[in-house]
C-alpha cells in the first residue's frame, strides 16, 4: 500500500540564515513544513529565510483563526501542540468553504475493519467505526456495507511506529492521530498508540476521528471552519456531536443531497442530486515513484508541484505528498497538461494544454481565461521561470521562446535552438523548472538534468527522478532519456535581461 501523506521529524537540527535553532524552535518550523505552510528548499535543505518563516506563520495563524502577526507567540505554539490529522492543509483558497479532493464513481461502498484498538472493548470500537460511516450516509445518498473478509473499498486499521500496512509510520501518543487516502484508494489508518475512548472527555474520541478520516476517504479535504468535523485539528470530545453545515455542504457537493423519505403514498417533489460532472474515463491514479511527469512547477510559497494525468502532488525532502485531482485545486483546469510555470515577478501561474493557456493567481482563475495561443506554437513540452533574468521560457521540440510577461514580446526570431542556450539538455523535455538560486532542472523520461547559473549541465547528470526527487526506494536506474540524445553546444546566445517599465496586454 502506498500511503501518501507528508511526514517530517520534529527534532532535526535546522538553521535559519545560518543561525542554529534551539529544540524549542525546531518543532514549529517542522510543523509548518509538514502541513504545507513552509516548503523546505531542495538545495541546501537546512536553510530557511526569516521572511519565508514569517509568511508561513501568518498563513497558519490566519487558517487557525489566531491573531495574524507572523510571530511565534504562545497562542500559535499552543495550536501547533494540539492533536490533529496527518493530512496536509491545502485549504480552499477561493472561499472558506469545504475543499473537494475527488469522489467515488459509485454510491454503495464496502468497508472492512482489519483490526481494533486495545484501549476499547471490541464491540464499542466497532460500533464507533460503524457510526462514523452512518454520520455521512445520514446526509448524503451513500450506503455502506461492512465485509468481514476479502477486498473492500475502504479499509480501516490501527498500527504504530512500524507497520506493513503503510510506509509512513506514526509518531506515538499525541500529535498525528490518523490519516487517510483520497478516492479511490480507500485506506484509513489510526495510530494505535493513542488512548482511544468513547463517551468520555479523556483520551481521543474514536468516532469523531474516524468520521473525519472517512470524510477524507470519501473525497473531502480540510475545512477552515474550526468547528467543522473536517477541520485539521482535533478539538476534543463532543457529547452531542453532529456534522457542521460546511461538512454537509461538502459531501453533498460530491454525491448530492439525500432524498427525503416519501411517507404513506403522498407524492413529494424531491430535489435532484447536484453532482459535479466526472469524466467517463478518468486517467488512472499515477504512482509518483514510476510515472513520467507531464509538468513540474515551483509554485507560490516555494511549494513544488508535480503533474501527471488528472492528478497533482507536492514534492518535498520527505518525498511525494498526497495526490489531488488537478481540478480540485485549480477549478476549471483540465488534466494531462503540457506545461506549468509560476512567475514570482507577477504572481501568475500559467498552465498550457494544446492550443490554450490558463492563468491563475494562487488557485483562482483570472478573468477571460482560458485563451488561445496565437503567437506561440501549441502542444508545448515544458515551461520555466528563470529568476536571474525574470523571464519565462517555453519549450517545444528542439526550440524555445523567451517571454516577458509584462511586455509584448517580439517572437519573430523564435523559436531558437535549445542546445544553443541550455547546454547539454535534451530536446523535447517533458518538464522543466528553476530553483530560487538560478539552477535549472529539465526532466525527460525517468531522469533529470541540473544546470548551473551559466545554464550548463553539471557533472554527474542525468540522475534518477524517482530516487532523488520522489525519494522512492532505489531501483535499477535507467539514465537514458526517451527519444534521442543531445549534443552539448554553446553558441553564445545572449539573454534578454531588460525589464519592461509598464505592464501591457499580452497576446498569447
Curated annotation (Swiss-Prot):
Gene3D superfamilies: Collagenase (Catalytic Domain), Hemopexin-like domain. Disulfide bonds join 289-472. It comes from Homo sapiens. Zn(2+) binds at residues 85, 212, 216, 222. One of its GO terms (molecular function) is serine-type endopeptidase activity. Glycans are attached at residue 464. This is Matrix metalloproteinase-19. The keyword Hydrolase applies.
Amino acid at each position: 500500500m502506498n500511503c501518501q501523506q507528508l511526514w517530517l521529524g520534529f527534532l532535526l537540527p535546522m538553521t535559519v540564515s545560518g543561525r542554529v535553532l534551539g529544540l524549542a524552535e525546531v518543532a514549529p518550523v517542522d510543523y509548518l513544513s509538514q502541513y504545507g505552510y513552509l516548503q523546505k528548499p531542495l538545495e541546501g535543505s537546512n536553510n530557511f529565510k526569516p521572511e519565508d518563516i514569517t509568511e508561513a506563520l501568518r498563513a497558519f495563524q490566519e487558517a487557525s483563526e489566531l491573531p495574524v502577526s507572523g510571530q511565534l507567540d504562545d497562542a500559535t505554539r499552543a495550536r501547533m501542540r494540539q492533536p490533529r490529522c496527518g493530512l496536509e492543509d491545502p485549504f480552499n483558497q477561493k472561499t472558506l468553504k469545504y475543499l473537494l479532493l475527488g469522489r467515488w464513481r459509485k454510491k454503495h461502498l464496502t468497508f472492512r475493519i482489519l483490526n481494533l484498538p486495545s484501549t476499547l472493548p471490541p464491540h464499542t470500537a466497532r460500533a464507533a467505526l460503524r457510526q462514523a460511516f452512518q454520520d455521512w450516509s445520514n446526509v448524503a445518498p451513500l450506503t455502506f456495507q461492512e465485509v468481514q473478509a476479502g477486498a473492500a473499498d475502504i479499509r480501516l486499521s490501527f498500527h504504530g511506529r512500524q507497520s506493513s500496512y503503510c510506509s509512513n509510520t506514526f509518531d506515538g501518543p499525541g500529535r498525528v492521530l490518523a490519516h487517510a487516502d483520497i478516492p479511490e484508494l480507500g485506506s484509513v489508518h489510526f495510530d494505535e498508540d493513542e488512548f482511544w475512548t468513547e463517551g468520555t472527555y479523556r483520551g481521543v474520541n474514536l468516532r469523531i476521528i474516524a468520521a473525519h478520516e472517512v470524510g477524507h476517504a470519501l473525497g473531502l479535504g480540510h475545512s477552515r471552519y474550526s468547528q467543522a468535523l473536517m477541520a485539521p485539528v482535533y478539538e476534543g470530545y463532543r457529547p452531542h456531536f453532529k456534522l457542521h453545515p460546511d461538512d454537509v455542504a461538502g459531501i453533498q457537493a460530491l454525491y448530492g443531497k439525500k432524498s427525503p423519505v416519501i411517507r404513506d403514498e403522498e407524492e413529494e417533489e424531491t430535489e435532484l442530486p447536484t453532482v459535479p460532472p466526472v469524466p467517463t474515463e478518468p486517467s488512472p491514479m499515477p504512482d509518483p515513484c514510476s510515472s513520467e511527469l507531464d509538468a513540474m512547477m515551483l509554485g507560490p510559497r516555494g511549494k513544488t508541484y508535480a503533474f501527471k494525468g488528472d492528478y497533482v502532488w507536492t514534492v518535498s525532502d520527505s518525498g511525494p505528498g498526497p495526490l489531488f485531482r488537478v481540478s480540485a485545486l485549480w477549478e476549471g483546469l483540465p488534466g494531462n497538461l503540457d506545461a506549468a510555470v509560476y512567475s514570482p515577478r507577477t504572481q501568475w501561474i500559467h498552465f498550457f494544454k494544446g492550443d490554450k493557456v490558463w492563468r491563475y493567481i494562487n488557485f483562482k482563475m483570472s478573468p477571460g481565461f482560458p485563451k488561445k495561443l496565437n503567437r506561440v506554437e501549441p502542444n508545448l513540452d515544458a515551461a520555466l521561470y528563470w529568476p536571474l533574468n525574470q523571464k519565462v521560457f517555453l519549450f517545444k521540440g528542439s526550440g524555445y521562446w523567451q517571454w516577458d510577461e509584462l511586455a509584448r514580446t517580439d517572437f519573430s526570431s523564435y523559436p531558437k535552438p535549445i542546445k544553443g542556450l541550455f547546454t547539454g539538455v535534451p530536446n523535447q523535455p517533458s518538464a522543466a523548472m528553476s530553483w530560487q538560486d538560478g539552477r535549472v532542472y529539465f526532466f525527460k523520461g525517468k531522469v533529470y538534468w541540473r544546470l548551473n547559473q551559466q545554464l550548463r549541465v553539471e557533472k554527474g547528470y542525468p540522475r534518477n527522478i524517482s530516487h532523488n526527487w520522489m525519494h522512492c526506494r532505489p531501483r535499477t536506474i535507467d539514465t537514458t532519456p526517451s527519444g534521442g540524445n543531445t549534443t552539448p553546444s554553446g553558441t553564445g546566445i545572449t539573454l534578454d535581461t531588460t525589464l519592461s517599465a509598464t505592464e501591457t496586454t499580452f497576446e498569447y
